[in-house]
Curated annotation (Swiss-Prot):
UniProt keyword annotations, A-Z: Membrane, Mitochondrion, Mitochondrion inner membrane, Protein transport, Transit peptide, Translocation, Transmembrane, Transmembrane helix, Transport
Regions that span the bilayer: 44-64, 82-102
Subcellular localization(s) per the UniProt record: Mitochondrion inner membrane
Its membrane topology: Multi-pass membrane protein
Protein name according to UniProt: Presequence translocated-associated motor subunit PAM17, mitochondrial
GO cellular component: PAM complex, Tim23 associated import motor
Record's signal peptide: none
Chief place where the protein resides: mitochondrion
Pfam families attached to this UniProt entry: Pam17
């Protein structure tokens, strides 16, 4: 009976197959690919921030253009045109703050296959940054802290330069104290 509906052959075929638990079907993300994805994420966030800033200002301007305001009466003691201009700038600022949320969502959708590995690599990268960064208590105008959070590291050369800058900061802090 099992042979008639095809279950018998399927169950025998799955038993005979060897299963490898220690390897995954995907290759691991290397540091160059991770840093390229990090750069792409940052650029997408900046572009979406610019777009949402303009959209927020436009939406605020559209709303203010449709309401009736008496131009001869001050609003909170200020000229109504100044208040409206400030509201448009405030709307653009709020839109700018929403940009990274949209940019990160777009980045996640675009790189859905590599997101799990990207997050793992990001945690490892942040642990490396935390381990190698300098103590900012000895900074001065002549000896500034080199990129405390590692936000501008987008290539291996940037990372190596950041490590050299951290070592130079430590050396200068030790010599001048």
């Amino acid at each position: 009976m099992l042979k008639n509906i095809g279950i018998y052959n399927r169950s025998i075929n799955t038993i005979g197959r060897s299963v490898r638990f220690n390897s995954s079907g995907k290759s691991s993300l290397n540091w160059v690919e991770y840093l390229n994805l990090k750069k792409q994420n940052n650029r997408l966030n900046v572009a979406s921030s610019a777009f949402t800033s303009l959209a927020g200002a436009f939406i605020t301007l559209t709303y203010l253009g449709n309401i009736e305001i008496q131009v001869d009466k001050p609003i909170m003691g200020l000229d109504p045109f100044m208040v409206m201009g400030g509201a448009v700038i405030l709307g653009g600022g709020v839109g700018y703050l929403f940009g990274p949320f949209i940019g990160t969502a777009l980045f996640s959708l675009k790189n859905k296959a590599a997101m799990h590995q990207f997050k793992i690599k990001d945690q490892i990268f942040l642990q490396k940054i935390k381990h190698h960064r300098v103590d900012p208590s000895s900074q001065s105008f002549s000896n500034p802290v080199p990129d405390y959070y590692g936000e501008r590291i987008y290539s291996l050369n940037n990372y190596k330069q950041w490590l050299r800058d951290c070592n130079a900061f430590r050396r200068k802090a030790k010599e001048f104290l």
